[in-house]
């Protein structure tokens, strides 16, 4: 079996878990994300297509949505397939802990090698967290 490229990010947010959950799972409100030009929602919201500012389209299929706890989807485009898992939990002091794990399988072995240079998963995840904190009013 092919080995995925994997990246994990953990963040602690001052906002209530319900607020964080609603922001992350609401694909109709995406303007706060600097990495997305537009999102097209299809199949009654079970699927969506994200378009980057460069015009790259990635299709997502929501596979699990346990309110305030876990959000999962598979994803793919012409370059890769993969899956993403988001875990949400409330801390003792009322903050929200999020753990996002992304696993991608690059279709072409040569592109996989090059992807370490032009597709920095950790940087992409950190950009998302920074954008999320701004949306939540935490920065």
Regions found by a protein language model. Give the residues of each.
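Hydrophobic ligand-binding cavity/cleft-lining segments
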Residues: 1-40
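Short, Lys/Arg-enriched, disordered terminal segments
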Residues: 1-6, 92, 134-139
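Short solvent-exposed loop/turn micro-motifs enriched in small/polar/acidic residues
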Residues: 4, 32, 41-43, 55, ...
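Short, structured interface segments that constitute the first stable element of a domain
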Residues: 39-60, 127-129
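Hydrophobic pocket/interface hotspot
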Residues: 19-24, 29-30, 48, 62, ...
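Hydrophobic-ligand binding "helix-grip"
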Residues: 53-99, 103-107
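A conserved amphipathic terminal alpha-helix motif
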Residues: 104-139
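Residue-level marker for the onset of beta-strands and adjacent loop->beta junctions
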Residues: 7-9, 35, 44-47, 58-59, ...
């Amino acid at each position: 079996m092919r080995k995925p490229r994997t990246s994990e990010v953990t963040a602690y947010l001052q906002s209530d878990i319900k607020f964080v959950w609603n922001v992350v799972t609401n694909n109709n409100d995406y303007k706060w994300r600097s990495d997305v030009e537009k999102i097209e929602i299809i199949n009654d919201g079970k699927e969506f297509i994200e378009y980057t500012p460069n015009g790259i389209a990635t299709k997502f299929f929501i596979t699990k949505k346990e309110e305030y706890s876990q959000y999962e989807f598979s994803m793919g485009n012409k370059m890769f397939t993969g899956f993403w898992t988001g875990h949400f939990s409330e801390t003792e002091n009322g903050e929200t802990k999020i753990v996002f794990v992304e696993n991608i399988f690059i279709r072409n072995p040569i592109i996989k090698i090059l992807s370490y240079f032009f597709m920095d998963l950790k940087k992409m995840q950190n950009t998302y967290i920074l954008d999320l904190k701004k949306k939540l009013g935490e920065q």
